[in-house]
C-alpha cells in the first residue's frame, strides 16, 4: 500500500526524475516562467521554493547547497544576487502554478505555467504605474 508516501513518480526512475527536476529548476530560474505538465509543475514547485529560501541567507554553505542542485556557478550567482533579494521578508509562496485551459495536443496531458511570483521587470506591489492623461499629450 502507498499510504503516506509524498511526491509523484512521474513515470520515471529516481535518477531520471532527479535530473529532470534539476533541469526544470534551472530553466525556471533562467526564464522565470516555463510551460510544462501540471504534475511536473507541482513537483517542481517544492524544489524551487527551497532554492529561493536558501538564497535569502547569503552564506558559503547556502551557495554550496544551491550548487548541489543547479550545478552552474552563474546561475547560483543570479539566484543569490537577483532572485533571492526580491523575496526578502516573504515567508514562502515564491512560485505560482497557473493551469492552462487547453491540454497538450499529442496526449491530452493537462498543462500548466509555473512562474516566479515576482518577475524581473514587474513593478513592486505598492507602486502601480499611473495611467497617462489624454490632455498631457499635446
Curated annotation (Swiss-Prot):
Ribonucleoprotein listed as a keyword: yes
Domain of life: Bacteria
One Pfam family here: Ribosomal_L17
GO CC terms in record: cytosolic large ribosomal subunit
GO biological process: translation
GO molecular function: structural constituent of ribosome
Keywords, alphabetical: Ribonucleoprotein, Ribosomal protein
Family: Belongs to the bacterial ribosomal protein bL17 family.
Quaternary structure and partners: Part of the 50S ribosomal subunit. Contacts protein L32.
Protein known as: Large ribosomal subunit protein bL17
Amino acid at each position: 500500500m502507498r499510504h503516506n508516501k509524498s511526491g509523484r513518480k512521474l513515470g520515471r526512475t529516481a535518477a531520471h526524475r532527479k535530473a529532470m527536476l534539476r533541469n526544470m529548476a534551472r530553466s525556471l530560474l533562467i526564464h522565470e516562467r516555463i510551460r510544462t505538465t501540471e504534475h511536473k509543475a507541482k513537483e517542481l514547485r517544492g524544489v524551487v521554493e527551497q532554492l529561493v529560501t536558501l538564497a535569502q541567507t547569503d552564506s558559503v554553505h547556502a551557495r554550496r547547497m544551491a550548487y548541489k542542485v543547479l550545478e552552474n556557478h552563474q546561475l547560483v550567482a543570479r539566484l543569490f544576487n537577483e532572485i533571492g533579494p526580491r523575496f526578502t521578508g516573504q515567508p514562502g509562496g515564491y512560485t505560482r502554478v497557473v493551469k492552462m485551459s487547453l491540454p497538450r495536443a499529442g496526449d491530452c496531458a493537462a498543462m500548466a505555467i509555473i512562474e516566479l511570483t515576482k518577475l524581473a521587470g514587474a513593478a513592486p506591489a505598492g507602486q502601480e504605474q499611473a495611467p497617462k492623461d489624454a490632455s498631457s499629450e499635446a
